[in-house]
A protein has these predicted regions:
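Sec-dependent signal peptide recognition
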Residues: 1-7
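N-terminal signal peptide c-region/cleavage motif recognized by signal peptidases
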Residues: 13-15
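Active-site acidic/histidine clusters and adjacent loop/turn architecture
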Residues: 19-86, 151-167, 173
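Extended, low-complexity, intrinsically disordered C-terminal regulatory tails
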Residues: 67-98, 175-201
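Envelope-exposed proteins and targeting segments
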Residues: 80-82, 105-109, 210-214
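Soluble periplasmic/extracytoplasmic beta-strand elements of cell-envelope proteins
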Residues: 85-87, 108-114, 177, 215-217
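Acidic/His-rich structured neighborhood in mature extracellular/periplasmic domains
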Residues: 91-142
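Catalytic cores and adjacent binding grooves of peptidoglycan-active enzymes
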Residues: 121-223
Length: 223
């Protein structure tokens, strides 16, 4: 009986290793093997586009998938009234991912900025073909867009959740790209001290503003 248990354990271990993704190169010049697709929705999150998912634009490294899904579970316990939405990630085999300059080896994920409506309720930022799946949205100087306002508490909590879930898997976040002009608002939340101490944010404005979404690169060992 004990011999059978050992054999089964070995087989399960081999199967687990075989199902893990392998990333190569960098986020800007790499590829991915055995990429996995993020779930289209969960109890407190949704994908930015069903059609984009069908077209294969929501694949990531298996470790990144586990981190992202677990972060939403953590947030459900901490902020049950909040909802979240993820956006572009990459192709199953990585490689060039237009129009993005990165997202090439399964370690890059875009998340749509959490927002609240006029009543202060957490809602999803609208993403459809008429606003380029949300990427064409621009918040004004008051952090508002068509009656919606940026939910900095939810945004900060999500980044913290991603970081903590990454550490539990013995990996990390490499960087978070978010409009530098808006970052002070993140640091004013209750998670501000943690973010300053543990998360590396972009210092300069990127080629796109990154106000309607924040880009996260994960630090996972690659070949």
């Amino acid at each position: 009986m004990s011999r059978l248990i050992i054999i089964l354990s070995v087989l399960l271990s081999v199967n687990s290793i075989a199902s893990e993704s392998i990333c190569y190169g960098t986020t800007s010049n790499g590829r991915l093997e055995r990429g996995v697709k993020l779930p289209s929705s969960g109890i407190n999150f949704v994908s930015y586009s069903v059609s984009a998912s069908v077209l294969g634009r929501t694949y990531v490294h298996s470790t990144v998938r586990d981190i992202v899904v677990a972060s939403y579970s953590r947030l459900k316990a901490e902020m049950p009234e909040k909802v979240f939405k993820y956006a572009e990630t990459g192709f199953k085999k990585g490689g060039e991912f237009k129009p993005h300059k990165t997202h090439r080896n399964g370690l890059s994920v875009d998340f749509m900025t959490p927002v609240m409506n006029a009543e202060g309720k957490s809602v999803h930022l609208p993403t459809h073909v008429f606003n380029k799946l949300g990427y064409n949205i621009e918040f004004d100087r008051n952090d508002r867009y068509k009656g919606l306002s940026i939910d900095y508490d939810a945004l900060a909590a999500h980044i913290v959740a991603l970081h903590k879930e990454a550490l539990e898997r013995e990996v990390d976040l490499w960087r978070v790209i978010f409009d530098p002009g808006l970052q002070p608002n993140l640091f004013e939340t209750k998670h501000g001290k943690y973010l300053k101490e543990h998360v590396q944010f972009s210092k300069k404005r990127s080629w796109v503003r990154h106000d309607e979404h924040y880009h996260v690169d994960f630090k996972v060992p690659c070949m």
